[in-house]
Amino acid sequence: MRQVSHSGRRPAPRAARASVRELIEQGARRLRRARVFFGHGTDNARDESAALVLHALGLSHADPAVYARRVGVRGQERVRALLTRRIEERIPAVYLTGETWFAGLPFYVDPRVLIPRSPIAELIERRFAPWLDARRIRRVLDMGCGSGCIAIACAKALPWAQVDAADLSAEALEVAARNVRRHRLGRRVHLVQSDHFSALGAARYDLIVSNPPYVGTREFASLPPEYRHEPALALQSGRAGLDSVRVLLAEARGHLRPGGALIVEVGNTERALERAFPQLPFLWLQFERGGGGVFLLGAEQLPADGAARPRRAGA
């Protein structure tokens, strides 16, 4: 006998449960249809959907069994709501989940800091081989540290080294401090609020690493809307995108020990930089996992403190 309600109506059928795997595929289709931009932690719709679905459900990607788990109505609603924010507000998924990975390590991020995505991660994982002898790197500076990901990854890869992490933004340093605590590196990673080298005194380093702002005014205006959620201070650097890099080139030698090195990511301003500084022997590093626009200069190859001058203004 079929059950009926006291009103004489049949009860509404239960909503169909869906597996986590099915929700991920559904989400990926939504993201592709919406033509969102990928590049802030993931480079495809399925990985982005997986990150959002698992976060909405409070599940870990490390457990393969979760993908077959069945999800009820409320869980599906949470997933749809998070995907809707990603699509309608164009918020990068990493800001919605608060979690990203860099050099094999997890980091907390929010809109106070740039989302880590630098190919420098690959250098750190290789301990800068074959270009540098890691055993001689005893003191490192991460200039423009943001979330602290480069500084922390260097400290993990070089457990004998002390690392300074400098940033102009007090808000960024708050995020970096949270990550330093998370990785229990308070005794080895030291945060400094500084406009480039201004607060570092006479400190000298074996290695200075930097992923500074390098986006020019015109390029910034043409970026996908996802970039508008990142701090402009961490992206823009003058009309041609070279303002911050010029400071690094002018002042880095005064903060490097003999035999030290400067490694800087400049993205697609590579050619503009070479035109502006034709006298500098930039070594452009290659990456197995893709990416580019990262140069290395030895301390002795850099101009004397304050002597770096571009060939023409606004180059």
What are the language-model segments listed below?
Residues 5-103:
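N-terminal auxiliary segments of SAM/dcSAM-dependent transferases
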Residues 24, 49-50, 79-80, 147, ...:
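A general structural signal for well-ordered alpha-helical segments in protein cores
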Residues 34-39, 127-135, 256:
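Alpha-helix termini
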Residues 45, 113, 241:
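Short, conserved glycine- and acidic-residue-centered signature motifs
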Residues 66-67, 73, 77-160, 166-175:
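SAM-dependent Rossmann-like transferase core, predominantly class I methyltransferases
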Residues 125, 160-162, 166-315:
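S-adenosylmethionine
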